[in-house]
From Swiss-Prot:
CDD domains the UniProt entry points to: Peptidase_C15 (cd00501)
Subcellular location: Cytoplasm
Protein's name according to its UniProt entry: Pyrrolidone-carboxylate peptidase
Organism taxonomic ancestry: Bacteria, Bacillati, Actinomycetota, Actinomycetes, Mycobacteriales
Residues at the catalytic site: 80, 146, 170
Record SUPFAM superfamilies: Pyrrolidone carboxyl peptidase (pyroglutamate aminopeptidase)
Record keywords: Cytoplasm, Hydrolase, Protease, Thiol protease
Enzyme class, UniProt record, top EC level: hydrolase
Pfam families: Peptidase_C15
Function: Removes 5-oxoproline from various penultimate amino acid residues except L-proline.
Subunit structure comment from the entry: Homotetramer.
Length: 222
């Protein structure tokens, strides 16, 4: 049976509970389209997150890697198309969980400018919508640890020539986090809805390696 590695992050910044962690933990051990899901929570820190994911890939030998993170302010699940070779969290007023602030620094000075996700992004979004979960394609994964890890994993797989497909899914805040005073008005999504959406996305990624060709309606501009 093939395996799917799902990664998530724990709390960070002013986010006391991360939907990526809860969703990853909920999916751990499930079977989706004949594949076993194995979840790992990786450090929400630059570089250590990549090292932890690389170790998990070596141990688990997955056919597919789906990385999860939170994107506050987005009202839908978003499947990322690109990962950039740049880290710039100072503009968010954020440091990683080790207190590190990177401003305009590359993940790998010798690496390419960006990588495309190797999962069928549009097909995954369409599958989520058919499951009743709002979702869209995103062309910008940010410049914090989410984008950093996505780039690092895709770079690692490319450098090693591993036959593993990988992609990133961003989740809205949890309702309990959106209810905090400093987040009032921020969109949110329950863990149950996030799990349903991610499950549909993983199933689509397992069932087809090539993306669908027809366009899908989109409202997200980034």
């Amino acid at each position: 049976m093939s395996k799917v590695l799902v990664t998530g992050f724990g709390p960070y910044g002013v986010t006391p509970v991360n939907p990526a962690q809860l969703t990853a933990e909920e999916l751990d051990g499930r079977t989706i389209a004949g594949a076993t899901v194995i979840s790992r929570i990786v450090p929400n820190t630059f570089f250590e997150s990549i090292a932890a994911a690389q170790q998990a890939i070596a141990e688990i030998e997955p056919a597919l890697v789906i990385m999860l993170g939170e994107y506050p302010g987005r009202s839908m699940i978003t499947v990322e198309r690109l990962a950039q070779n740049v880290n710039d969290c100072g503009r968010y007023g954020l440091a990683d969980c080790a207190g590190r602030v990177l401003v305009g620094e590359p993940t790998d000075p010798a690496g390419p400018v960006a990588y495309h996700a190797t999962v069928p992004v549009r097909a995954m979004v369409l599958a989520m919508r058919k499951a009743g979960v709002p979702a869209d394609v995103s062309d910008a994964a940010g410049t914090f640890v989410c984008n950093h890890l996505m780039y690092g994993v895709l770079h690692h797989l490319a450098q090693k020539g591993l036959p593993v497909r990988a992609g990133w899914i961003h989740l809205p805040c949890l309702p309990s986090v959106a209810a905090l005073d400093h987040n009032l008005g921020v969109p949110s999504m329950s863990v149950q809805t996030a799990v349903a959406g991610v499950t549909a996305g993983i199933e689509a990624a397992i069932r087809q390696s090539a993306d669908i060709r027809e366009p899908i309606p989109s409202r997200l501009q980034i």
